[in-house]
Amino acid sequence: GTNDFPRARAFYDAVMAALGCKVILEYPGAVAYGKLYPEFWVQAPIDGRPASVGNGSHVGFFADSKAQVDAFHAAALAAGARD
């Protein structure tokens, strides 16, 4: 989850395009990205409590090439991520 949905939305709008993904579904406080179907969601917590670190969580994305990984990384840095 995220505690700042508008900021998270702007970040993922910028970086998911580097993997060829687009917005597939969106709801108030939630958005799903993918190529043909939802592959990745980001949303504000539905229980109204603050988002927290998910112990043991893992997030991965499909990429077609190292060049696409590099483009995703560059887009993430440009959108405010840190190395």
Which residues are covered by each model-predicted region?
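Core segments of cupin and vicinal oxygen chelate
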Residues: 1-40
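Vicinal oxygen chelate
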Residues: 3-6, 61-83
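Long, continuous compositionally biased terminal/linker segments
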Residues: 34-71
